Structures are given as structure tokens and as C-alpha cells.
């Protein structure tokens, strides 16, 4: 009980009522949470059919799907632990970055870009907990565009063409955004029977409405569904939020996996893949300062992410021979592991405006907490994100190359901490913080969606606990930088629209020492080079076509696959979380088919939406298709489900290798 509260409430009926209310809200905070999967108690040297390294977005989905097969035994290892409560409440997403559940990766300083960032390096937040980055991202549901997957298919085969990947997006999706559900033309591209909820909001923030109006004035059409293929403009994203809480492959799939043949080890750091005679046979891992070995009878699968997957491959002898030999690592397979690193390049533009511009939905914090505890509504339950997609030219009006992401920041906001988390340097954050004491800030993230620049990931040393070296390579191709004068000027033009003009909005050009005394376009290029950072969507370091094949098998190594964002040969035009789930879903079916196991869950070949079946699904790469010709109603997906009996699987401890192993993993 709060000090002095008893005497304040009194002893009568009113006091009893208020006391009960206080106790109710104190108790309901305990209901904000999740019962996460428990650690297993395993014999050192235990054997499994499949060992999956990394319980992030991909690993959680893949482990859950493989565990649907009764005679598959699966071990899932995660370097982190359980997500904190902040990972569940949407509004607290930013507090997880630069925390103990973040790998806190950074790029290597190159003295060419990012001079306006702290230490001249780009921040690369990645989730180090169950759910991985799916437990700390912004929950934006984006898929990319059909042309992205036509590129993939040309490199890795027709498994990855748009028509096929769309079926897998729909398989996992449970769309509840009423703006989409009530529109048959939109719903033809969405699922209603999947595990992960994709929701909208009927209470769009005031500032978001004003941004949409501003973009409409600037010539953008308003798009009701930001995943709709071949249609670009400005609009609000749907989000993976269920009943006011973050949804993800962890919560929707792994948490609901009931198989006794799925074992999970948390706080377990995998240090090496064991490869013998060209075959991956297991992994080496450290838990509680002890080293353990586990063996895979069928496959080792890496789902450790764009930075840790190449690190593990290289530590295990799979990588560029010159780099491995320079560290004294025996080369098992000479592959361009770590190459092809690329990301959406992001530069911030700034406006200031009169107080009252944002009209924040953030009511007094305690009231928002009460609303959230009571019925999971209010500001804490939201993740309002919007964007405006821009084509490169009018000749390709349905394929975006750039995006603008605006945010309105009320006066006296705790902007400084977020600024530093983003990675801007102290001087710049202080300048913006001081402006926010007088004005409201508008930030517009200008993002290049299809960069040509490439970087790389290399080993720092042979110590597996050392972070990899991340050479971002941003603007290594000057052509990428050349786009930003146009893009930043488009962001600035928001100040000239009716509402923002009425609020005296004006452009702020932050002081960047290297960029003084330049013309406007030259200043923008200089500033962009100095301020550019990652949009936290890095991909490509174990790419299909060069490191893995179209079935995600590592070239030249038996029994080893990669299933995560690192396999993307080219980045998609949008946030990468939903595509990573899709990759895991496809991988699960590829593995089941390889071992002659029937697929489980939604029968994709019989998937029906309205009277549109998977076999008759239109080629969406043709923007002139008349969807009205193929849609007559908005029936829900008719899923053919295959029931699978889950049986206990005996975990066998090897005897021939037991001399190497003395301990048992004892987990509470």
C-alpha cells in the first residue's frame, strides 16, 4: 500500500471502493506479461533431428513448424533470455534498444560517412532474447513489392517468386485491420486464419492525419493498405499487435507449440558448428561458463541473423578463404560469407513548428497506464507508423525506391535520450533538445529502399564472444547519395503545406562542421553523408545464389541451412520482419518435403479466398489486372488442416563422444 493511502481513503464505503480500485490496478500489472517457454534439462551430447541456432523471428517460427511433425526432434538455442514486459507493451518499444536485451552491434568507423553520429558509427540494434528483433522492433507489417521477389526468383528459383511467397505471407497472417477486412479488393491479398495478428487502429493520431493531408497536398494518393502490390502513395501501416500487445512468431507460434519433442535452451551461446567430412553434425555452445556439445542427425539450421549467422559460419571454416586463413582458421568451404551486406540508408530531416502542432495523444502518464491496465487501450497500446512511398521516376509509378517516415514530437519531450539511442552525436542531440524546449519538432526519416552500396561482415578475432566487424558500406556507391537532395527537399516541402504553414513550420539545418559554406544541394549531400545511418534492416550476408541455394542449403556442406534475413539476395522495399517469417514458413515446408513429410497447417494448394484459389491467383506483377473480375465476395480462407499426432521422442545421449562431455545442462 502506498504510504499514507489508507488514512486518505477512509474507512467508509467510498474508502473501501477506492481501495479496491487501487488494489485492482496494482494487481492487473501482473497480467501484463506472458508465460514464456521454459528451459529444458538436457544431457550433454544429446542428439536431435534438427538443431536451430537462434530463437528470433525466423527460429521461433521454424522450430514451431518443425515440431508439428511427430517424429521430428528439435533443439532450439537462444543466446538471450525471456523478453521483459516492455517487449509486450507497444509504446515501450524504444526503451529496449541499447539495453541488456539488445546485441548493441555497431558499424566500424570509416571516416567517410556518419561523422555526425556518435563516434562516427551506425547503431545496429538487434534483439538478444526470445523472439529476437521481433521482440523489439516497431511491429510494422510490410512485405515489400512483387518486383522484389521477381529479383529473388531470378537468382534462387521460382520458390521465391511473388505468387508463391504471397501464399506464405497469407498462411501466417490473421488480418483484423477493419480498413482492409471490409474491402474485398484488398482482402484478396490477406489471410484470416493465420497465427500472427495484423491489426489496425480506428483512432489514428492527430499528427498522422495531418501528415496524410500534407502528403495529399504534395501529390501523393492516400493508400488504405500499405502492403497492396503495385500501388504506392502515403498511408498508415498495419501492425503485429493483438489486443494491445505485441504479437510475433514467438508469441503466436513458438509459445503455442505443444510438442514434447521440441526442447529450448535459453542463455546459451553457440560458438561453433561442428563440421566433419563436409557435413554439419552438431554445434558447440557455452552455458553458465561450461561448454556443451549437441548433435544433429539431420540438419543444423542457422537463424542467428544478418550479423551472427555469418560470424558462426566463418568461425566454423565456412567463408572467404583469404579472410579465414588470415585468422588461422582452416577453410572448410570457400564461400563469400559476410559479403553483400546492405541496408536501407536513412537520413533525418528536421522542421520546427509552433506548440500545439502535434496535439499529442499522450495524456498524463498515469491515466494512460490505467487505461492500458484496464482494457489494453490508449497510447500505450499503439504503434502508429506511416510512410509515403516515392518512385524513382514517373515511368515506374508502382515501384517505390524511396520512403519518407514523418514523426511529430511535442514540446518538452524526452527527445534527447531517443536521439542518442538513434546514434546522433552529443552536439547534434543537444541542439535538437534545446529547440524542443521552445518548439515542437517534426522529424522526417528519408530512406533509400533499394541501395546499390554494399558492405561486409568479418570476424574480429577467433574469439566467438567478440562481436563481428560490420563494415556498413553506406554510400560506397555515389549514386545512392545522389538521390538525397531530391528526397530531403521533398521532406522539407511538408512545411509548405496548409496545416504546417499555419503552424509556422520551418526547416532546421543542423550544424555539421564539414558542411558549412555550401550551396543548398551540396549542403544536403554533405549533410546526408555525415548523418546517414541504418534503418535497422540489414540483409544479405549469407545470400541465396552465392552462399546458400534456393532451398537455403549452404553450398558445399551437407546438413547445414540458413533461415533468416541473411539469405535475402537483395533487400525488399519495406520492413523485413514479415518477410523473415515468410522465409521461415517456406523453409519449414522445404524441410518437410525433403524428408517426405506432409505439410501441416494451411494447405496452400487448396487455399481459397472468395472464389480466388492459389492455382488461379493473378500475376500481380501486371498492374493493370482488374481484381473485380476475380473477386465477388470476401470469404475467409478455407484451410485444409492435416492433424498430426505429437508423440514423445526419446533424447539419446551419445556414448562414442561421451568422453568429451562431463556435464549436464541443469536448468531451472
From Swiss-Prot:
<dbReference type="Pfam" id="PF00732">
    <property type="entry name" value="GMC_oxred_N"/>
</dbReference>
<feature type="active site" description="Proton acceptor">
    <location>
        <position position="537"/>
    </location>
</feature>
<dbReference type="InterPro" id="IPR000172">
    <property type="entry name" value="GMC_OxRdtase_N"/>
</dbReference>
<dbReference type="InterPro" id="IPR012132">
    <property type="entry name" value="GMC_OxRdtase"/>
</dbReference>
<dbReference type="Pfam" id="PF05199">
    <property type="entry name" value="GMC_oxred_C"/>
</dbReference>
<dbReference type="InterPro" id="IPR036188">
    <property type="entry name" value="FAD/NAD-bd_sf"/>
</dbReference>
<keyword id="KW-0285">Flavoprotein</keyword>
<comment type="function">
    <text>Involved in the inactivation of ecdysteroid molting hormones by converting ecdysteroids into 3-dehydroecdysteroids.</text>
</comment>
<feature type="binding site">
    <location>
        <begin position="536"/>
        <end position="537"/>
    </location>
    <ligand>
        <name>FAD</name>
    </ligand>
</feature>
<dbReference type="GO" id="GO:0050660">
    <property type="term" value="F:flavin adenine dinucleotide binding"/>
</dbReference>
<dbReference type="InterPro" id="IPR007867">
    <property type="entry name" value="GMC_OxRtase_C"/>
</dbReference>
<dbReference type="GO" id="GO:0016614">
    <property type="term" value="F:oxidoreductase activity, acting on CH-OH group of donors"/>
</dbReference>
<keyword id="KW-0274">FAD</keyword>
<feature type="binding site">
    <location>
        <begin position="137"/>
        <end position="140"/>
    </location>
    <ligand>
        <name>FAD</name>
    </ligand>
</feature>
<protein>
    <recommendedName>
        <fullName>Ecdysone oxidase</fullName>
        <ecNumber>1.1.3.16</ecNumber>
    </recommendedName>
</protein>
<keyword id="KW-0560">Oxidoreductase</keyword>
<feature type="binding site">
    <location>
        <position position="270"/>
    </location>
    <ligand>
        <name>FAD</name>
    </ligand>
</feature>
<comment type="similarity">
    <text>Belongs to the GMC oxidoreductase family.</text>
</comment>
Amino acid at each position: 500500500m502506498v504510504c499514507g493511502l489508507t488514512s486518505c481513503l477512509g474507512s467508509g464505503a467510498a474508502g473501501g471502493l477506492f481501495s479496491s480500485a487501487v488494489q485492482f490496478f496494482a494487481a492487473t500489472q501482473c497480467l501484463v506479461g506472458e508465460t514464456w517457454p521454459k528451459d529444458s534439462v538436457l544431457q550433454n551430447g544429446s542428439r536431435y533431428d534438427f538443431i536451430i541456432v537462434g530463437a528470433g523471428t525466423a527460429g521461433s517460427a521454424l522450430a514451431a513448424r518443425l515440431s508439428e511433425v511427430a517424429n521430428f526432434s528439435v533443439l532450439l538455442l537462444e543466446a538471450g533470455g525471456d523478453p521483459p514486459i516492455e517487449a509486450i507493451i507497444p509504446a515501450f518499444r524504444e526503451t529496449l534498444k541499447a539495453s541488456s536485451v539488445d546485441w548493441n552491434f555497431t558499424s566500424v568507423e570509416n571516416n567517410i560517412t556518419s561523422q555526425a553520429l556518435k563516434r562516427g558509427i551506425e547503431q545496429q540494434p538487434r534483439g538478444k532474447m526470445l523472439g529476437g528483433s521481433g521482440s523489439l522492433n516497431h511491429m510494422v507489417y510490410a512485405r515489400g513489392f512483387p518486383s522484389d521477389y521477381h529479383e529473388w526468383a531470378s537468382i534462387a528459383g521460382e520458390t521465391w517468386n511473388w505468387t508463391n511467397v504471397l501464399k506464405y505471407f497469407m498462411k501466417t497472417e490473421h488480418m483484423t485491420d477493419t480498413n482492409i477486412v471490409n474491402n474485398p479488393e484488398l482482402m484478396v491479398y490477406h489471410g484470416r486464419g493465420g497465427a500472427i495478428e495484423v491489426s489496425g487502429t480506428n483512432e489514428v493520431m492527430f499528427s498522422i492525419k495531418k501528415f496524410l493531408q500534407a502528403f495529399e497536398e504534395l501529390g501523393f494518393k492516400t493508400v488504405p493498405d500499405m502492403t497492396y502490390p503495385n500501388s504506392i502513395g502515403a498511408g498508415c501501416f498495419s501492425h503485429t499487435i493483438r489486443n494491445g500487445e505485441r504479437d510475433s512468431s514467438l508469441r503466436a507460434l513458438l509459445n503455442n507449440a505443444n510438442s514434447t519433442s521440441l526442447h529450448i535452451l535459453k542463455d546459451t551461446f553457440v560458438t561453433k558448428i561442428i563440421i566433419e567430412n563436409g557435413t554439419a553434425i552438431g554445434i558447440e555452445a557455452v552455458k553458465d561458463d561450461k561448454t556443451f556439445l549437441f548433435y544433429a542427425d539431420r540438419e543444423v539450421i542457422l537463424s542467428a541473423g544478418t550479423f551472427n549467422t555469418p560470424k558462426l559460419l566463418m568461425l566454423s571454416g565456412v567463408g572467404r578463404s583469404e579472410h579465414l586463413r588470415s585468422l588461422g582458421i582452416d577453410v572448410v568451404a570457400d564461400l563469400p560469407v559476410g559479403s553483400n551486406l546492405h541496408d536501407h540508408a536513412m537520413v533525418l530531416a528536421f522542421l520546427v513548428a509552433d506548440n500545439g502542432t502535434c496535439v499529442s495523444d499522450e495524456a498524463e502518464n498515469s491515466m494512460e497506464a490505467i487505461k492500458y491496465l484496464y482494457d489494453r487501450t490508449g497510447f500505450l497500446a499503439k504503434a502508429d507508423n506511416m510512410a509515403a512511398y516515392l518512385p524513382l521516376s514517373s515511368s515506374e509509378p508502382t515501384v517505390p525506391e524511396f520512403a519518407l517516415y514523418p514523426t511529430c514530437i511535442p514540446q518538452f519531450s524526452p527527445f534527447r535520450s531517443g536521439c542518442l539511442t538513434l546514434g546522433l552525436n552529443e552536439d547534434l542531440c543537444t541542439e535538437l533538445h534545446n529547440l524542443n524546449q521552445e518548439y515542437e519538432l517534426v522529424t522526417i526519416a528519408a530512406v533509400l529502399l533499394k541501395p546499390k552500396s554494399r558492405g561486409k561482415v568479418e570476424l574480429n578475432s577467433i574469439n566467438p564472444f567478440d562481436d563481428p566487424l560490420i563494415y556498413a558500406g553506406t554510400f560506397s556507391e555515389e549514386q545512392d547519395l545522389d538521390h538525397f537532395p531530391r528526397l530531403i527537399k521533398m521532406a522539407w516541402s511538408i512545411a509548405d503545406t496548409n496545416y504546417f504553414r499555419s503552424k509556422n513550420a520551418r526547416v532546421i539545418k543542423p550544424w555539421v562542421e564539414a558542411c558549412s559554406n555550401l550551396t543548398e544541394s551540396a549542403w544536403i549531400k554533405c549533410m546526408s553523408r555525415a548523418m546517414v545511418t541504418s534503418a535497422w534492416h540489414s540483409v544479405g550476408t549469407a545470400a541465396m545464389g552465392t552462399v546458400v541455394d534456393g532451398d537455403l542449403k549452404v553450398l558445399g556442406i551437407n546438413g547445414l541451412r540458413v533461415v533468416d534475413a541473411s539469405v535475402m539476395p537483395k533487400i525488399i522495399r519495406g520492413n523485413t520482419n514479415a518477410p523473415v517469417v515468410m522465409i521461415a514458413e517456406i523453409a519449414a515446408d522445404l524441410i518437410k518435403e525433403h524428408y517426405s513429410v506432409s505439410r501441416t497447417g494451411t494447405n496452400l494448394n487448396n487455399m481459397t479466398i472468395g472464389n480466388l484459389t492459389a492455382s488461379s491467383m493473378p500475376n500481380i506483377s501486371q498492374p493493370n489486372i482488374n481484381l473485380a473480375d476475380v473477386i465477388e465476395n470476401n470469404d475467409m480462407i478455407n484451410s485444409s488442416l492435416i492433424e498430426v499426432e505429437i508423440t514423445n521422442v526419446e533424447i539419446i545421449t551419445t556414448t562414442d563422444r561421451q568422453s568429451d562431455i562431463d556435464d549436464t545442462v541443469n536448468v531451472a
